[in-house]
């Protein structure tokens, strides 16, 4: 239970509960929404919400195999374990969302993130976290460790442009959208 481990690791006493929300995408957002609801319903006064996301290992060929798949479900509903990429393809097809529209939305998202970070919109909501970053020199195969302080989401790309997005190849092959 990563939520419980995080609570204890942060120095909270053992009587403070922790829980995990398992979603392959948006678990952090869901954890925050659950916490906000607990406060709104006056069930809790203080809640810490966060997430641990890793969508790099949910595609079928790289799937984490430690989670079992129910054979009866697989027989009766074979798409029950559909990956997020496959799900996105279904949504894009069903609602006729073109590659161009997806690229425009992705660009807008990158720009909004950059703007919000640049203007400090989330500074009061994000607590800096000190951690150790592992770096690997590809040429020498040497591994280095660096103490860092994470103060914002590091994954946005402010230099993103529509041309760069349109040049990205679809993950599932040429006939796909995503």
Predicted regions and their residues:
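Acidic side chains
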Residues: 22, 45, 70, 86-89, ...
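Proline- and acidic/polar-enriched loop/turn elements at helix boundaries
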Residues: 19, 51, 59, 104, ...
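Active-site-proximal alpha-helical scaffold in enzymes
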Residues: 5, 23-52, 92-122
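A short, structure-level motif marking secondary-structure boundaries and short turns
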Residues: 20-21, 72-74, 98
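Conserved catalytic cysteine-centered active-site region
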Residues: 1-45, 79-86, 158-178
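Flexible glycine-/small-residue-enriched beta->alpha junction loops
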Residues: 36, 41, 45-94
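N-terminal extracellular/periplasmic Venus flytrap/periplasmic-binding protein-like
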Residues: 101-178
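Short acidic, glycine/serine/threonine-rich loops at helix termini
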Residues: 1, 57-63, 140-142
């Amino acid at each position: 239970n990563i939520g419980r481990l995080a609570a204890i690791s942060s120095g909270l006493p053992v009587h403070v509960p922790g829980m995990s929300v398992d979603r392959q995408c948006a678990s952090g957002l869901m954890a925050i929404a659950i916490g906000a609801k607990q406060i709104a319903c006056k069930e809790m006064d203080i809640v810490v919400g966060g997430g641990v996301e890793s969508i790099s290992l949910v595609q079928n060929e790289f799937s984490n195999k430690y989670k079992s798949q129910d054979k009866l479900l697989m027989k009766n509903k074979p798409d029950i374990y559909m990956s997020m990429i496959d799900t996105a393809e279904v949504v894009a097809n069903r609602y006729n969302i073109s590659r161009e529209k997806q690229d425009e939305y992705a660009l807008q998202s990158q720009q909004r993130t950059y703007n919000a970070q640049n203007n400090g919109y989330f500074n009061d909501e994000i607590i800096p976290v000190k951690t150790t970053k592992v770096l690997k020199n590809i040429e020498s195969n040497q591994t280095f460790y660096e103490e860092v302080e994470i103060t914002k989401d590091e994954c946005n790309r402010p230099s993103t442009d529509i041309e760069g997005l349109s040049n990205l190849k679809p993950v599932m092959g040429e006939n796909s959208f995503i």
